[in-house]
């Protein structure tokens, strides 16, 4: 497992953003783990998280020249990532959307750098149903931008349903025709748990969950 994946998972565990136990998801599934990016709730935690994102993006070789953060969690993530890249000598333009359009001031739903003609990388925490990402794709295209990729913190790599064996990330990637990458995925989480004495007890529930809900590419 590459270093940024291990660093991210340890950071998430330390921040209590990654928890193990029994959690009922919005889908109704009973999951042995839960990820909440909202627990990266300080400058230091967010800065470290952004470095993990940047390492994952660079490792994937994504081609982009603007960062876009969908409201709401994508906004601080994209902002922190822009700061991380500035520290690496790359000053990237940044934009995000608001949920409700304004009819005063600058107006509209978009804030930040113009999207027209830009290769836009969408930055978010997870892809659950894909609704927010699809909205972001539509907003970017309507503004003349060209979506070039999507990056999230954690890919759960689980099927949408028994009828659709793809994950939400796989479905979005196929629909949009762009790469979707994650800092870490369920396969990485399994490897991380196996190498952590405090988490070995969760290995069996994780494997059972992957067996029931994992995509064919989970590994």
UniProtKB/Swiss-Prot annotation:
Q: How does it assemble?
A: Homodimer.
Residues reported in the UniProt entry to bind 5-phospho-alpha-D-ribose 1-diphosphate = 26, 72-73, 98-99, 102, 104, 124-132
State the family named in the UniProt similarity comment for this chain.
Belongs to the purine/pyrimidine phosphoribosyltransferase family. PyrE subfamily.
Sites binding orotate sit at 34-35, 128, 156
**Which SUPFAM superfamilies did the record assign?**
PRTase-like
Question: In what pathway does it function?
Answer: Pyrimidine metabolism; UMP biosynthesis via de novo pathway; UMP from orotate: step 1/2
**Biological-process GO terms, alphabetical:** 'de novo' pyrimidine nucleobase biosynthetic process; 'de novo' UMP biosynthetic process; pyrimidine ribonucleoside biosynthetic process
According to the lineage, what is the superkingdom? Bacteria
Question: Which source organism?
Answer: Xanthomonas euvesicatoria pv. vesicatoria (strain 85-10)
One Pfam entry name: Pribosyltran
| Cofactor(s) the protein requires to work | Mg(2+)
Query: Which Enzyme Commission number(s) are listed?
Result: 2.4.2.10
What GO molecular functions are on record for this protein?
magnesium ion binding; orotate phosphoribosyltransferase activity
Q: What does this protein do?
A: Catalyzes the transfer of a ribosyl phosphate group from 5-phosphoribose 1-diphosphate to orotate, leading to the formation of orotidine monophosphate (OMP).
Q: Which InterPro entries match?
A: OPRT, Or_phspho_trans_dom, PRibTrfase_dom, PRTase-like
Where is it found, in Gene Ontology cellular component terms? cytoplasm
Catalysed reactions, as listed in the record: orotidine 5'-phosphate + diphosphate = orotate + 5-phospho-alpha-D-ribose 1-diphosphate
What is the name of the protein in this document? Orotate phosphoribosyltransferase
| UniProt enzyme class | transferase
The alphabetical list of record keywords is: Glycosyltransferase, Magnesium, Pyrimidine biosynthesis, Transferase
PROSITE patterns, alphabetized: PUR_PYR_PR_TRANSFER
């Amino acid at each position: 497992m590459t270093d940024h994946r291990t660093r991210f998972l340890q950071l998430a565990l330390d921040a209590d953003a990654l928890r193990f136990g029994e959690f009922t998801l919005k889908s109704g599934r009973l999951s042995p783990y839960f990820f909440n990016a909202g627990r990266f709730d300080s400058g230091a935690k967010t800065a470290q998280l952004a470095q993990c994102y940047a390492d994952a993006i660079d490792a994937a070789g994504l081609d982009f020249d603007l960062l876009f953060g969908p409201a709401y969690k994508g906004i601080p993530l994209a902002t922190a990532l822009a700061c991380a890249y500035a520290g690496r000598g790359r000053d990237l333009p940044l934009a995000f959307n608001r949920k409700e359009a304004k009819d005063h001031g600058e107006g509209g739903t978009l804030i930040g750098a113009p999207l027209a003609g830009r290769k836009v990388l969408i930055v978010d925490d997870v892809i659950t149903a894909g609704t927010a990402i699809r909205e972001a794709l539509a907003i970017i295209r309507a503004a003349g931008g060209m979506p070039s990729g999507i990056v999230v913190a954690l890919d759960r790599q689980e099927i949408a349903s028994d009828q659709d064996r793809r994950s939400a990330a796989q479905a979005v990637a196929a629909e949009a025709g762009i790469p979707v990458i994650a800092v870490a995925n369920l396969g990485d989480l399994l490897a991380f748990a196996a190498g952590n004495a405090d988490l070995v007890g969760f290995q069996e529930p994780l494997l059972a969950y992957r067996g029931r809900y994992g995509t064919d590419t989970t590994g």
